[in-house]
Amino acid sequence: LDIGSRHDQKLALAVEYLEYLGTNEYTADQISTEFYKLACNYGVSTGGEQSYVYLNGLASEFDEAVKLFEHLLQNAVADEDKLKQMVAQKLKSRNDAKLNKGAIMGRLRNYALYGEENPSTYFLSEKELAEISGEELTLYIHNLSNYKHKIWYSGPLELSELDAKLSAVHTIP
């Protein structure tokens, strides 16, 4: 996807939140179990300028895996308790980093290279984290497919067959 955390800091948080979510039909554990049954896995990560979404698995389970992944992205349901736990862990990690010599040196290096406004200071504040809602983050997840993106495929399907299968469940903007 041609969007990253430098475009919107909440996107990275939403992507991290996805792994804790279920849908209107499945709990988070059931989603995990379904992907396991299909011998597939997925992931979403956010860099500064781009985000990456991947789905790995067996060719024989391609249709079902894509369908399940699309279902997860389009129907993820907010879980405020999981969000609170995730935010608490993020704040704890930040506090722990204040005691880590390597992290301190990295922040100091960024300050020396870039000045007061640098990559080490570009994150959501504690107040912003406390105010964010699960509903707001799930909107980011629901909209992932709406961003301009490219699809890379490695497998036995011919391009025409792949296009037909993906077109049935996925829209490319």
Model segments located where?
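An aromatic/glycine/proline-enriched structural segment found at the starts
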Residues: 120, 147-173
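M16 family metallopeptidases and their MPP-like homologs
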Residues: 1-19, 23-75, 86-95, 100-128, ...
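Short, charged, amphipathic alpha-helices and their helix-cap/turn boundaries
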Residues: 129-133
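A common structural junction motif
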Residues: 71-80, 167-173
